[in-house]
Amino acid sequence: LNECKQLNENQVRTLCEKAKEILTKESNVQEVRCPVTVCGDVHGQFHDLMELFRIGGKSPDTNYLFMGDYVDRGYYSVETVTLLVALKVRYPERITILRGNHESRQITQVYGFYDECLRKYGNANVWKYFTDLFDYLPLTALVDGQIFCLHGGLSPSIDTLDHIRALDRLQEVPHEGPMCDLLWSDPDDRGGWGISPRGAGYTFGQDISETFNHANGLTLVSRAHQLVMEGYNWCHDRNVVTIFSAPNYCYRCGNQAAIMELDDTLKYSFLQFDPAPRRGEPHVTRRTPDYFL
């Protein structure tokens, strides 16, 4: 799998069944111990995921926490998600994989994963095995009780982590409501709650982040979901950090990627990286459409 090779259809089915058994036991707020390296969107950029492991350390030597969006937009969604799920099955205590807004049946039919499965396997079975598995992915993680990690952001219907623990996550990502918000929301310069330009989730201001962190005894909300040119970006007076781990996103954005290392004492440091050198990849001119949900 490390050589960007595919499994056959039956192997994928078996892999997904095994992964379900493991993920079923995990919480909506999955507890994670430091040291751990926290990663943002990967989006099927397999060679850049290899670069991430080169920079951050191989699994299982390094503990990893991925905050979703493994598929769509990049050319190697199949190989990327297969590898991450295989690592989860092999080293369940060493890697945590959360759900992103792209780990959904609906979104993957628009942004590439469905078409890629069809192209590589000749039918939609592999897409079905993976999207069924996505329903089992934990929504959020909590590192040593202090750093709260999730794909998108906060929700007006959630005040405490216990509210999240009480959600039924075994379903397709809904169009609205708390589960949707956790995967779709974005921090914003404006205070309070706002309508999201994405058409799902909300924008939330610094007042919201500070209140949430204080109420839940947190020092930081770590999230992904937004392209940031340096690979990471602080906002809300360091109550929130955005981490994005797909360099030169969509093979055309020119951004750096980053990962956040948390040591034994929860001290953080960021490692930035550029795209892996590429050979023989098609040149992209097509503009990928932005969300129109």
Curated annotation (Swiss-Prot):
GO terms for biological process: mitotic cell cycle. It is found in: Cytoplasm; Nucleus; Chromosome, Centromere; Cytoplasm, Cytoskeleton, Spindle pole. The modification Phosphotyrosine is found at residue 291. Mn(2+) 1 binds at residues 41, 43, 69. Its EC number is 3.1.3.16. Reversibly methyl esterified on Leu-293 by leucine carboxyl methyltransferase 1 (Lcmt1) and protein phosphatase methylesterase 1 (PPME1). Carboxyl methylation influences the affinity of the catalytic subunit for the different regulatory subunits, thereby modulating the PP2A holoenzyme's substrate specificity, enzyme activity and cellular localization. Phosphorylation of either threonine (by autophosphorylation-activated protein kinase) or tyrosine results in inactivation of the phosphatase. Auto-dephosphorylation has been suggested as a mechanism for reactivation. Its main location: cytoplasm. PROSITE patterns: SER_THR_PHOSPHATASE. It is an enzyme of class 3 (hydrolase). Keywords: Centromere, Chromosome, Cytoplasm, Cytoskeleton, Hydrolase, Manganese, Metal-binding, Methylation, Nucleus, Phosphoprotein, Protein phosphatase, Ubl conjugation. Binds 2 manganese ions per subunit. SUPFAM superfamilies: Metallo-dependent phosphatases. Found in a complex with at least ARL2, PPP2CB, PPP2R1A, PPP2R2A, PPP2R5E and TBCD. Interacts with TBCD. PP2A consists of a common heterodimeric core enzyme (composed of a 36 kDa catalytic subunit (subunit C) and a 65 kDa constant regulatory subunit (PR65) (subunit A)) that associates with a variety of regulatory subunits. Proteins that associate with the core dimer include three families of regulatory subunits B (the R2/B/PR55/B55, R3/B''/PR72/PR130/PR59 and R5/B'/B56 families), the 48 kDa variable regulatory subunit, viral proteins, and cell signaling molecules. Binds PPME1. This is Serine/threonine-protein phosphatase 2A catalytic subunit beta isoform. It comes from Sus scrofa. The lineage of its organism: Eukaryota, Metazoa, Chordata, Craniata, Vertebrata. The gene is PPP2CB.
